[in-house]
């Protein structure tokens, strides 16, 4: 009797979640589980400079496909996660991270995988340009492509969707992360593809990591109570949240900490009238602190801890690579409350994102990027 009651509670919980998180299907009535059943060579893509959500959502899908079983399909499936460039060292502990291929370092090995793939799973981006040179190669292969993402679509991307680039689209800007969407898919749509109805610990760990990192440890974009019901389920599945937090946030190098101190002490400008902070870091300055990918992660949030600072922007210079004449400036935008930064990021800095968290980039010098900033902030910021 007790077992029956537990099953009823379990089923009721996911009926509620299904109501909370209705997904937007693509224009074709194709079952994703069926696509996975038929596919033999699957490639999973995520965006440049992979963060916790990119890593978590792609690795959760990777583990799922590896464990996929059905009554019709039992043979081995080749599945590979390919990222455009290196991911931060503080995410290298994630289950399966050692199997990820980095296109920037392994393009010769990656290109045949992309060309031979019969299914692409694309997570945490909606613009093929966000995966660098792999984007064109993905577009050249006419096999089914599934999109899972929580970023806003501009008109150009909506046009690609309308043209049928993706055979299935799960786009939910209201979700806190792509991992939230992946969780919903795995639990409600694809669960029958697993050997049993457990959510394996590897998948649960990857999903929790994405939820945690994309909300700043649940400090922003995390007010929906349904999110905490998902977290509760993941904890019941065996996720060790304290260990994950320690692995992500308490493993910084000495150089990273010194870079953070330098950025806040020497490089932060405050615009009091506009409640705005700006931090700029040149490539030479980053070299002084032996910069590694991810060392500036979270830096943009720190000025928001200052009283009366509601907007924060960071700029980080990447040197021009061989064959490219200009440096690339990476920008991060953060804000608090009803103060959007995504329009500013989109219209001025070729980026976009969420209302309170966006990104952008500029091809050119750091001085040029700062000039764009100085000529535009008064238009986009509420005083």
Set out the residue ranges of the language-model regions:
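Active-site cofactor/cluster-binding pocket
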Residues: 101-167
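Short alpha-helices
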Residues: 150-230
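Short glycine/serine/threonine-rich phosphate/pyrophosphate-binding segments
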Residues: 52-58, 128-132
């Amino acid at each position: 009797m007790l077992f029956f009651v537990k099953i009823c509670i379990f089923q009721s919980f996911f009926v509620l979640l299904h109501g909370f998180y209705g997904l937007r299907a693509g224009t074709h009535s194709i079952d994703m589980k069926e696509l996975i059943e038929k596919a033999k060579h699957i490639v999973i893509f995520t965006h440049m400079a992979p963060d916790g959500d990119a890593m978590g959502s792609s690795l959760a899908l990777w583990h799922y496909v590896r464990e996929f079983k059905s009554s019709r399909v039992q043979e081995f499936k080749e599945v590979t996660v390919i990222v455009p460039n290196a991911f931060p060292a503080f995410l290298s502990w994630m289950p399966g991270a050692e199997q990820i291929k980095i296109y920037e370092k392994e393009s010769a090995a990656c290109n045949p995988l992309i060309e031979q793939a019969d299914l692409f799973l694309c997570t945490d981006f909606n613009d093929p340009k966000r995966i660098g040179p792999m984007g064109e190669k993905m577009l050249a292969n006419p096999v089914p492509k599934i999109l899972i993402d929580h970023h806003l679509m501009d008109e150009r991307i909506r046009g690609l969707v309308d043209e049928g680039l993706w055979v299935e689209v799960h786009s939910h800007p209201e979700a806190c992360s792509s991992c939230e969407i992946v969780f919903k898919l795995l639990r409600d749509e694809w669960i029958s593809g697993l050997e049993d109805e457990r959510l394996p610990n590897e998948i649960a760990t990857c999903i929790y990591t994405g939820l945690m990192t994309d909300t700043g440890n649940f400090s922003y974009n995390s007010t929906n109570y349904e999110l905490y019901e998902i977290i509760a389920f993941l904890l019941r599945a065996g996720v060790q949240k304290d260990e994950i937090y320690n692995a992500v946030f308490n493993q910084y190098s000495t150089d990273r900490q010194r870079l953070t101190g330098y950025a806040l002490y020497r490089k932060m400008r405050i615009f009091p009238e506009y409640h705005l902070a700006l931090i700029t870091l040149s490539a030479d300055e980053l070299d002084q602190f032996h910069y590694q990918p991810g060392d500036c992660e979270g830096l943009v949030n720190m000025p928001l801890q200052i009283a009366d600072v509601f907007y924060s922007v960071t700029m980080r210079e990447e040197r021009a690579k061989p064959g490219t004449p200009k440096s690339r400036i990476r920008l991060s935008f953060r804000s608090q409350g009803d103060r959007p930064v995504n329009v500013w990021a989109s219209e001025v800095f070729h980026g976009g994102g969420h209302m309170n968290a966006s990104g952008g980039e500029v091809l050119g010098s750091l001085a040029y990027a700062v000039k764009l900033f100085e000529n535009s902030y008064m238009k986009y910021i509420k005083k």
